[in-house]
């Protein structure tokens, strides 16, 4: 995940 985004789930 990133600071405010979790494209993997």
Swiss-Prot record:
Disulfide bonds join 1-6. The modification Glycine amide is found at residue 9. The keyword Secreted applies. GO terms for molecular function: neurohypophyseal hormone activity. Keywords: Amidation, Disulfide bond, Hormone, Secreted. The keyword Disulfide bond applies. One of its GO terms (cellular component) is extracellular region. This is Asvatocin. It comes from Scyliorhinus canicula (Small-spotted catshark).
């Amino acid at each position: 995940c990133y600071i405010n985004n979790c494209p993997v789930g």
